[in-house]
Amino acid sequence: MSDRDQIEPVTNALDAESDSSDDFGNFSDASVENDLYNQNSTLTTSSESVVDNCLNKILPKGEFDLEEETIKNDCFKLSKLIEDERPHVIYEQLVQLDPVLQPFIWNKSHIRRNLLHILRLSDNNGSEGVGTKREEEPLNDELFKRICDAVEKNEQTATGLFLRDNFKIDYTPPMTLKSLQKEEEREQEQHIPQLLMADFTSMDEESLRQYHDTLCQSIDFLVSKSRSLKKQQRDLLKDKTTFENVVTNLTGHTQRLQRDEIALYNKKRNKKKRFSWVGY
């Protein structure tokens, strides 16, 4: 046989083996996949054990039991501390009840003022115009005191203009019809708060004069109303005193009648007992 004839059977055998391996798969590849799976499972197991070891070091099982015992001991100590009435009330107000906390206002807090003072900063937030605010002189209340004294004396004036007759203040009296006087007084009373809030510093001479007259008329109205209320108060006190005297007299008269009835009953009863033997 020639060399060519010997090579052909060997080649055919190799081809047959390759065909058989293609039919059932590559066994060499299967062994490599198994090795990779074993390596992955080993890595997974080792990583889980590492995590478990770390957790056991950080959170050992024995500490939980110790913490429960510590909590129980603390609760027992706390119950001992608040056995008395005063500590119990303080604990209830601070812990158990919901405290009503006042809202913290930063712009008005002393912490902000101290901080600005330490840092040498100017306070421009919410306090603009404080430094430039016009300084007002305190009002003299001498007139108010004299008016109150005159109201207490209840002295009647000739014209009914209180300020003009008592203090010689010149102003224009109100020009109102008698039928519309009550309505005018009601409106005047409603406008008194506006008079007190008015800024008279920026008024001209005519407006200032009108404001002065309106203010004096309002003072006359308030004095008149105060006098009427004082008179009504005196009448009510007089009625109250009369009612109390009537109630006292009625109470005494009722007690007197009750004593007389009891005495009459006892007298009849004693008389009946004295002559009770006559019937036998």
From Swiss-Prot:
Deletion consequences: Leads to a severe defect in clathrin-associated adapter complex AP-1 localization. Causes increases in the calcofluor white (CFW) sensitivity in cells lacking CHS6.
Disulphide linkage map: none
InterPro entries linked to this entry: YBL010C/LAA2-like (IPR031355)
Motif (Ear-binding motif): 19-30
Cellular component terms per the entry's GO annotation: clathrin-coated vesicle
Subcellular location: Cytoplasmic vesicle, Clathrin-coated vesicle
Pfam families reported in the protein's UniProt record: YBL010C_LAA2 (PF17104)
A GO biological process held by the record: clathrin-coated vesicle cargo loading, AP-1-mediated
Transport in keyword set: yes
Key words of the record: Cytoplasmic vesicle, Protein transport, Transport
Positions of the UniProt region annotated as Disordered: 1-26
Keyword Protein transport: yes
Function in brief: Involved in localization of clathrin-associated adapter complex (AP-1) and subsequent AP-1-mediated clathrin-coated vesicle cargo loading. Directly mediates the interaction between LAA1 and AP-1 which is required for AP-1 localization. In complex with LAA1, cooperates with the small GTPase ARF1 and the phosphatidyl-inositol-4-phosphate (PI4P) synthesis to confer temporal specificity to AP-1 recruitment.
Complex and partners: Interacts with the clathrin-associated adapter complex AP-1. Interacts with LAA1.
Record-linked PANTHER family: EXPRESSED PROTEIN (PTHR38698), FUNGAL PROTEIN (PTHR38698:SF1)
Domain notes: The ear-binding motif (EBM) is required for the interaction with the clathrin-coated vesicle and its recruitment to clathrin-coated vesicles.
Miscellaneous comment text of the record: Present with 1320 molecules/cell in log phase SD medium.
Protein name (database record): Clathrin adapter accessory protein LAA2
Organism: Saccharomyces cerevisiae (strain ATCC 204508 / S288c)
High-level lineage: Eukaryota, Fungi, Dikarya, Ascomycota, Saccharomycotina
